[in-house]
Amino acid sequence: MKKAILFFLTFLFITRESIVAQRFLADVDSSFYIKDTVRPVIKRFANLRITGYIQPQFQVASANGIESYEGGSFSAHSQSRFMLRRARVKIEYALPSKTSGNPAAFFAFQVDGTERGVAVRDMFLKLFETRKNKFSFTAGLFGRPFGYEVNLSSAYREMPERGRMSQILMPRERDIGAMVSFEPMNKKNKLSNFKFDLGLFNGQGLTGSTDFDSRKDLISRVYCKPYELNDFSISGGLSFLNGGWKNGTKYVYKNGVGQNGDAIFIVDSTQANIDEIAPRRYYGADIQVKKEFKWGATEFRAEYWFGTQPGTSSTSTSPGVLPVANGNPLPTYIRHFNGAFFYFLQNIINEKHQLLLKYDWYDPNVKVKKQQIGKPGTNLTPADIKFATSGIGYIYHLNKQTRVILSYSMVSNEITAMPGFASQLSDNVFTCRLHFIF
């Protein structure tokens, strides 16, 4: 009977305390640092916490079977669907330090269960340096430390999905690797407002079961936490990724100019290209500005990426396995890309109502434009077409744990000479989502 009562009290404590989970992937919520003397009755469980959220939703597309980045493409004969976008449960454990109020170690395990199956999303261990409380080491499966949108948890992101560029270049956001972080925990430290991450990752993320070559991605990010001045705050960061993957063939296509002056892909078929590294380099910068009012807040976010992305003739998506067709490796296409995300968030009337505006674009090949794509002999494909998405949304907060999200995403594509892309596609999506977090 005592064990049953203890378990019940523990469940109530964990549930109540875990409403505020960490806002960013792989971060540790400071409210989780609980001393054994706070609640002696449940001190054996005080450092264990269970959090999670569920996102059932209904969507309507502007046409049947569209390719979409709003939760995945629609079935060939369908333009509406109910789906369980995410349903996640996360177990966290913090090992208290004997010398400070900060943890000595932190373990996290998160699973995602939907109608499409169950998959692991996080499984990592974070060790803290407890003498000066400045450094930590993370190893396992966790979020890549690149950019703001990629690391903002889906439990807190206002629009239903991350931008197209995030999903193509950083599919599923996480990867297996190890990372060192500099983040002074003492607020009196002059650098306590800064965080620096530096990590090595396999590169394939959750899109592959194992690393298909020995090349690793080096990812770093320096982030300035919100600097507050009265009701105004500003934060921002710089990110860098340097990696790549091995060419499976000797054929490597790069941007060039044809004899008639057209922008084309030119093939390099040097035998030495086999097993050479196709460069993958990203550069990113982001800023977040927020103004608080008695009745709510106004927030603006901007983020810009550019760099080099290896892919195939048909896609610029970062691969989880070596790209092949009929068992044979595919030629590598090197593209130079850029893209951005812009958010505007505004409370209206009070904190229960929030208006959302978002704009993002992804240009997979900045060396070519519009009618150049689709010309015979250029080797250009739909994978070189620029897409932009404008989104408008509304959130109604029923309570601290429950909200209703309504959004409409309008997608525009470059008008090209490519069959099927000589006009605007009909691929807009309306989403109605119920979001509950615990």
Residue ranges and their predicted role:
Residues 1-24:
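Bacterial Sec-dependent N-terminal signal peptides
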Residues 19-51, 62-71, 249, 401-402, ...:
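Outer-membrane beta-barrel biogenesis signature
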Residues 22-55, 113-117, 214-224, 270-282, ...:
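Short, charged N-terminal helix-start/capping segments
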Residues 24-25, 63, 75-76, 232-240, ...:
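Outer-membrane beta-barrel pore domains
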Residues 39-63, 70, 74-206, 212-219, ...:
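Outer membrane beta-barrel
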Residues 208-213, 418-422:
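Short, solvent-exposed loop/turn segments at secondary-structure boundaries
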